[in-house]
Amino acid sequence: MTWPRQGLAKLLGIEHPIIQAPMAGASTPMLAAAVSNAGALGGFGGSDSDPEELREVVRAIRRLTDRPFIINLYVGRANPYVSAAEDERALKQALAPAHAELGAGEVPDPVDLFVSYREQAAVMLEEHVPVLSSHFGAPNADIVRALKANGTRVIVSATTVAEARHLEAAGVDAIIAQGSEAGGHRGSFAARTGHSGIGTLALVPQIVDAVSVPVIAAGGIMDGRGIAAAFNLGASGVQMGTAFVACPETAANPAYVKRLLHAEPEDAVLTNAISGRPMRVLRNKLVDLLEQHEEHCLDFPEQLSMTRNLRKVAAGTQDAEFLALWAGQGVKLARAMPAAELVQTLVAQAQELLRCHHH
């Protein structure tokens, strides 16, 4: 059976219009290749990889698949970081006991965790990456033009209709309509972040009506029911992150996966406290601790950098209480199965439902 809307699959050169969200920290070349080889679009979150690491990742994926794949990068910040000495001091004080308890040494100074977007984009051009997505807005017009001229498809997240219109004007090939149910960072860039939090069900048809490029639904989609619903809302495809975290091919910490597989939807909270930008994670001691000191929250990504040593130690000891546990509201539907099998299951479920509706 074919999908109700073919545009996106044709645009991206894939069989099934399902994108595995390129999640920084959880994605691996193995996961990306497994998903792509199954006919969907596998991805790798490269936001915190330096340019040469990124090049190696792209080549590693290409050794495992000859199919298209997607790399995600964060668009760099608009304004330089303004040091907030008082807030930094308060946070260091707040985080010191946890560092002592976990044996994580001194609380580190804040740093900008992200490499230059331009340097990363240069590697994307040199390596002819098939699909590039960006979070927190569209790359500069010159970069978008260069990527498109080079054969790379550019897709970007929008959390409001206004953002979607802005992205279409910026020349992106497709738009991810990211509902507030989504795990990880909200891709907001023009909206006053955190105020409206429009859900997927409401956002998708409004963006579909507002733009002429294909729309990819994201946020809370976990199974064939969600995929079929997205198509019925006018989407041309879906992007799913939380659904893939428990696949054995990911780099997700075992403690994170275990917590994810036992979580309730209300455990997935939207907070600025982890990174300095709104992101949905499972509530744990780290969230509680940082939320108690939310008035001292630094900018993104300096806020995230304050807990880098703590999270590193917690990852080593598999302590889920001090990890950033990215998860969307569909978390209870997460399944631990190999990525290829998950793709096949999703396709079968969705097509069964869509077949019924289209007769």
Outline where the language-model segments fall.
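Active-site entrance/lid segments in N-terminal catalytic domains of soluble metabolic enzymes
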Residues: 1-210, 346
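Conserved active-site-proximal phosphate/metal-binding subdomains
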Residues: 96, 185-190, 194-216, 221-359
